[in-house]
Amino acid sequence: MKNDKSLQGVTSIPGFKACGIASGMRRSGRKDLALVLNTGKNPVAAGVFTSNRFAAAPVLYSRAVLSKGATGMRSVVLNSGSANACTGENGLKDTVATAKAVGTALEMDPRQVLVCSTGMIGTPLPMDKMLSGIETAAASLSEEGGADASWAILTTDNEPKTVHYQADGYQIGGMAKGAGMLAPALATMLCVITTDALLDAETAQKALEVACAKTFNRLDSDGCMSTNDTVILLASGESGKVPSGFTAALTETCAQLARKLADDAEGAQHTVEIAVTEAENEAGALIAAKTISRSNLVKTAIAGCDPNWGRIVSELGTVPESVCPYDPSKVSVLFNGVQVCKNGAAWGSREDVPFDSREVHLEVRLGAGKAQASVLTNDLTHEYIHINADYSS
């Protein structure tokens, strides 16, 4: 069972309040609006956003606001149900109005507010419900509101994803959503991370970029990149600790959240780690691992508990030699520690491969060097098709 701090996520950290409410934006009546407030004396923010060219209005807005000044950033408002993507100028105006409403409700400059949305693309925000919901949310902020906030940002997720990490003299908490459209870069996901570490804006931004590159950008559930992917880091500075190893601690926190996202991938029965080892360089190993992770044939084989190494090497073979050099006659493949391919040919018995747990570890040894890289993915099942066929578009 999770400890209370882990369940609280963003509010497990000194200097933060949050809430999650049902504003009526979702027909189901479930929670759909979250608000996170940094009450610390030294507020700083950082952000990493989708590279999708159809980036949603809240992404464009938050990216622009952060670029003009991350110091003093105090709040994030997040809604589920409407992505506010591909909504034109009105969508951007609605995002600005959302930030202004939060600023008014919390008595702060709207430029201290970041905005995130998730849900249906092309659906305008129901601004009447959004604006009235913001007033309710502002009055509902609590130091114990992190759990409710984590529920309010979900779409097709089965459960919220929250973490708490105790570092040396400071803490990091977080919440994330995402079960489908998980693919670099980032990997649809929204994530808010909080810390009481004392950071400057440059340190926070650099640390977040490194952490995302090593975790969320190595998560590829279904090869589909969202228009709304956003990771926000808020630092309160309440610990007074200027950390020396913050990037490593933040990376571990993000890794825990990435694993939770993979474990809750739409319809998945297996969470799969694909490691490409003995590569000439890490960049090539990473591209090879990502290529294998996006193969529907590999993913369906794993869904059927079939250690089909032929599909793996076939996909590996599509990676250009200039990108990932290796000799096919030296490649080996292991499923859950059991070798099924050695030196580019069948080896051992596929029946020896255990598939008795959700976790599947796939290792591809290139025999070309000492570098390695890994990605997280999942299998592809009938349930994934049902979920996405039934999700209104």
Sequence positions of predicted segments:
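A structural signal for small-residue-enriched, beta-sheet-centric alpha/beta enzyme cores
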Residues: 2-79, 83-96, 103-393
